[in-house]
From Swiss-Prot:
GO terms for molecular function: glutathione-regulated potassium exporter activity. It is a multi-pass membrane protein. This is Glutathione-regulated potassium-efflux system protein KefB. The keyword NADP does not apply. Gene3D superfamilies: 1.20.1530.20, NAD(P)-binding Rossmann-like Domain.
């Protein structure tokens, strides 16, 4: 695929995504299923625009690679160590039990025992790309169900390495001393990557940032991601695992958030490409000729996997409210099954018919997951929103609320308690089902649902409410809600939480003036108390705090069009710091002559 052929393929992919995904969202089946359907439409069994599916599928794995890098950035070695019990307990248990059960079923359906073993292991793997995307959409990524799901996926990624090593043994090619030498060299190269990354990456990025050219920083981020992926691929290991480790090595660096911003656009596009490629890989010929076998295989895979995951979640102590979501989101086959089964076919562990059948089962199981999660959502809505009406509209007992609060984590709870203490009528929308369950025990009227859905906002009373307070964890959700409210509820006053300066800039650019950066006010208050401890007069410390607040807000507005780390911004920040020092010096001279303020401020 070269020249104009590549450009044509890119054009077809973009057109398919632009057409299919908005339609899928309007139909309520989700973006992931929209991508899969688009892939079927343009693939060999659809309109036939693209036929070289294997090459596209291999390239599209970069979407998973970028996703794992960003996940690695959000972790650090200490947090990873905290997850060891769930990774090697639940993760290992899920792979071993699922592989044993599914492998036994394959053996009893005329698979040779070698083929049954590798088939069971491959089917035990879940789709990292799909599961993480759905966990983010459903708000699971910050509750215990999402954490446990991530641990299971991480163990599965690591389990691919010994699974690939197992294939030659099952094929009867145990190998000799040369193979052990190759394994030793791979281990040494992997250790070299860890050590080199640990001591070279931060100095590299410091050197690049010093140039003041943002494009070079983005290029360096892409170099690290693609370089670590190709290095691991050359070793015969998981590309996604390599970039995940690279992300962890940079997780505690000062460049963490800027790297996320640089990589995010590529991750989204390539993940979409991955899902389209999976849809293209669906062999409808096998589906038609083995329809009953395929349908039974998909049902068995999803049911058995969900049941095992649900049981493990119960043993692990997961709350009942999140067990269903945890079991459903990991119930499908995964992208690593394509790698394992193809390798097994090349070693003649699987024959052509078995390979085609297993790949179709895996692909269709991936298509069932978005639908299964919608069914689970409906079950949870009925359970936690106490729906009494027979229609299918979202149910919220709004009672004409004055304020709608979206997100009821620690930040949202403080706001809610303050408003309720002042007899304000509020409606709270939260999509973390475990938080809904817990808050209801304490008497809060919290309703389960995704506030980015227009019907839920209407049911919550957005047309009559005076204000909406947005405290979402994800910046994308915050901006989606802002646009939704501005378009459909123009009289609804928007107040929002910003997690940092980048999100604050986005809110300002979209006309939201009432926002609070979550750490800014508390940090200022602690700074004021530090000034008091150092002997500053209370009134003077308060005025210093207010001067700093006003100047920082002015800088936020002035620097809005500029990018973080640009030379112009750095220069303006230094200028503002000097300006602030001059203000404080004048204040101190004035206060030394006339201290007519109060003596205490507590």
């Amino acid at each position: 695929m070269e020249g104009t052929g590549l450009l044509t393929a890119v054009l077809v992919f973009l057109f398919a995504a632009v057409v299919a995904v908005p339609i899928a969202q309007r139909l309520g089946i989700g973006a992931v299923l929209g991508y899969l359907i688009a892939g079927i439409a343009i693939g060999p069994w659809g309109l036939g625009f693209i036929r070289d599916v294997d090459e596209i599928l291999h390239f599209s794995e970069l979407g998973v690679v970028f996703l794992m890098f960003i996940i690695g950035l959000e972790l650090n070695p200490a947090k990873l160590w905290q997850l060891r019990r769930s990774i090697f307990g639940v993760g290992a248990g899920q792979v071993v039990i699922t592989a044993a059960v599914l492998g036994a079923l394959l053996y009893f359906t005329q698979f040779a025992w070698q083929a049954a073993v590798i088939g069971g292991v491959g089917l035990a793997m879940s789709s990292t790309a799909m599961a993480l995307q759905l966990m983010r959409e459903k708000g699971m990524n910050r509750n215990e169900g999402g954490q446990l799901g991530f641990s299971v996926l991480l163990f599965q990624d690591m389990a691919v390495i010994p699974a690939l090593a197992l294939i030659p043994i099952l094929a009867g090619n145990e190998g000799g001393a040369n193979d052990w030498v190759k394994i030793g060299l791979k281990i040494a190269a992997f250790a070299g990557m860890l050590i080199g990354g640990r001591y070279l990456l931060r100095p590299l990025f410091r050197y690049i940032v010093a140039s003041g050219v943002r494009e070079v920083f983005t290029a360096a981020a892409l170099l690290v991601v693609l370089g670590s992926a190709l290095f691991m691929d050359a070793l015969g290991l998981s590309m996604a695992l390599g970039t995940f480790i690279a992300g962890i090595l940079l997780a505690e660096s000062e460049f963490q958030h800027e790297l996320e911003i640089a990589i995010e656009p590529f991750k989204g596009l390539l993940l979409g490409l991955f899902f389209i490629s999976v849809g293209m890989a669906l062999d409808l010929g096998v589906l038609f000729t083995h329809l009953l076998d395929v349908l039974l295989g998909v049902l068995a895979l999803v049911f058995i996997k969900s049941a095992i995951l649900y049981g493990l979640a119960r043993v692990f102590g997961l709350r009942r409210s999140v067990r269903l979501q945890f079991a459903g989101v990991l119930s499908q086959g995964g992208e690593f099954a394509f790698v394992l089964f193809s390798a097994a076919f090349s070693q003649r562990v699987l024959n052509a018919e078995q390979l085609a059948l297993l790949l179709v089962v895996v692909t269709l199981s991936m298509m069932t997951t978005p639908l299964l999660m919608q069914v689970i959502d409906r079950i949870l809505v009925r359970r936690y929103n106490a729906q009494e009406e027979s229609d299918e509209k979202p149910f919220v007992e709004d009672n004409d609320p004055q304020v709608i609060i979206v997100g009821f984590g620690r930040f949202g709870q403080v706001i809610g308690r303050l408003l309720m203490a002042n007899k304000m009528r509020i409606t709270v929308l939260e999509r973390d089902v475990s938080a809904v369950s817990m808050m209801r025990k304490y008497g809060y009227k919290v309703y389960y649902g995704d506030a980015t859905e227009l019907e839920l906002l209407r049911a919550a009373g957005a047309e009559k409410a005076k204000a909406i307070v947005i405290t979402c964890n994800e910046p994308e959700d915050t901006m989606a809600l802002v646009h939704l409210c501005q378009q459909h509820f123009p009289n609804l006053h928007i107040l929002a939480r910003a997690r940092g300066r980048v999100e604050a800039h986005e809110l300002l650019q979209n006309g939201v003036k009432d926002f609070t950066r979550e750490t800014f006010s508390s940090a200022l208050e602690l700074g004021r108390k530090t000034l008091l401890e150092l002997g500053m007069h209370p009134h003077q410390a308060y005025r210093a705090q207010q001067h700093f607040r006003r100047l920082d807000m002015r800088m936020l507005r002035e620097l809005m069009p500029q990018h973080h780390g640009d030379v112009a911004q750095i220069s303006r920040i230094k200028e503002a710091r000097r300006e602030l020092e001059d203000i404080f010096q004048r204040e101190m001279l004035h206060e030394s002559r006339q201290l007519d303020g109060w003596d205490e401020y507590e």
